[in-house]
């Protein structure tokens, strides 16, 4: 049986106890208790806080479905960092400690599931190829599992996520098999599956036996744009995505787009770079000359697109945050500037996924996901548990998100 739940990560503009109340009143069976630096911070939680949460849950109809240890927890501008596979042991231990605190809170509240994410390959991994990130991740998971006592019914879950080291269900299932513990399983996010699996319906069915918990949100097609560092062996597939190539010697960027190639610069472009640009574009049969755009003239302030662009940029692996931050005004320019036809150069949200579906959590019913087929695939493959709506992009419109999600998803579960 699949039961609907709602994550407090989408209700962070109120007190934690109030969040439990509104989910309860909305009719959900469960609630995900998500760590948050300002709302439910495990480093600040007192025994009195735990007692108050426990008392609230005992008097409500809603049940605690899972403790989420909040990938975004530590540094707002650099979410997911440090991760369980950070090269610096101090960083890994910070994340391990957070997951262990999740297990401790779950123990005190009688919750049986605790979830986390793998983290991303970052520039530190690229610059240290002798270090195996999978080994670091596995060592960290084993360390977290030590926190679970032999007589406890607590399971640790990993959530595959677009762009992360563990991104697809195949990667997730392989990791579960290799960890080889009955206390370690999968947490599937249906939006992530839509982004990362060519046949997400079949993938849901295949992964169901490994899965103890679900996240739910909607999503839709975007403009797939890959940011990559310039290298001689780069290969481009314009049927899959457009590319924004970063040149480390000048910190310039080349947009490889068949309709409107562009070169973003802030110093005069030397002849050898112009020749290189032409060679790259010619290699993918782009005959148009790249427009030169002065980076220093790009608007770099706040825009209504900030949330969308931030979500996109933090999902790009293998590059430093400085490279990604420097790309932000470029993405804003492409999304907000109109071409000769009166349309934005990038007329859909930016995606960095395996399918072109945007990793942006939409309210169920406002995207293009097939929820009927998705839930059928899970049920037919014996999944039973909570499906928690996670809408952290809709905190300001939480009432609509809470009610519309329940109304739409109740048709299918």
Predicted features and spans:
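Hydrophobic faces of well-ordered beta-strands that scaffold small-molecule active sites
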Residues: 2-8, 31-33, 64-69, 114-116, ...
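Conserved, mostly hydrophobic/aromatic
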Residues: 6, 23, 31, 57, ...
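Active-site beta-loop-alpha junctions enriched in small/polar residues
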Residues: 7-11, 34-36, 69-72, 119-121, ...
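Active-site acidic/histidine proton-transfer and metal-coordination neighborhood
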Residues: 17-18, 59, 74-185, 255, ...
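Catalytic domains of carbohydrate-active enzymes, especially glycoside hydrolases
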Residues: 17-36
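Gly/Pro-rich active-site loop or hairpin
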Residues: 20, 42-44, 86, 169-173, ...
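Acidic (Asp/Glu)-rich catalytic clusters
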Residues: 20-26, 45-68, 104-110, 145-151, ...
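Glycine-rich, proline-tolerant flexible connector loops at the mouths of alpha/beta enzymes
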Residues: 34-58, 118-125
